[in-house]
Amino acid sequence: MNTDPFETFTADELVIPHGGIPSAAQWIMMHESGGSTTAGHLHAQGRGDGTPGNHSSAFGAFQMIEATRKRYMGADYQSTDFSKQYSAASHYVTDRYGSWDAAQRFWVGHHWY
């Protein structure tokens, strides 16, 4: 019985727009959300005093925070549509890192992007 509240997909099960996404984008997505367009985020670390981690506004397949989703998705910032999330993430990555490969290299070093 699956007790995970978020549906997750393997890389082969994803519906990919326009024939595919870069492998670095897929790698980041799988590390961030397991491919779930409805995934929320809970910080694993607490304050060190037994207090659990805090929720963040990160959401979706690429775990973009709310302010970033609003910037790149506008009124659709809460959309669970993969194509919209991927498009927004691609614009964010291009603006911040220049490419998905550069974003992946940053993620490997910092465990976020």
Mark where each language-model region is.
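N-terminal secretory leader/proregion of peptide precursors and effectors
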Residues: 1-20
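Peptidoglycan cell-wall recognition and remodeling modules
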Residues: 20-113
